[in-house]
Amino acid sequence: MLKSIEKLLNCWDDLKVGNHSSKRIHSVFYYMYFGTIICEADYEREEFKLPYNGAYSHSASTRRAVNDYKRYFLGKGFTLTEEAAV
């Protein structure tokens, strides 16, 4: 897992680490890469979405970031409710 993503996942406040950032609104966290939401996690419902389908879709770094979030939340027992093709 990327160190920057690991820092975001271990923080309960808004944070920016390099090109990665997070925004918290109530129990929902929005994880962004270059300002675009690539993962949305609801800690209350234990669900997450991977709604990303944007300009960086062919980038290996974007695919890696999306896969890191997916692996992390599935490992925590969260349910994947939406996944866009990357």
Briefly describe each language-model feature range:
Residues 1-86:
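Terminal leader/tail segments of proteins
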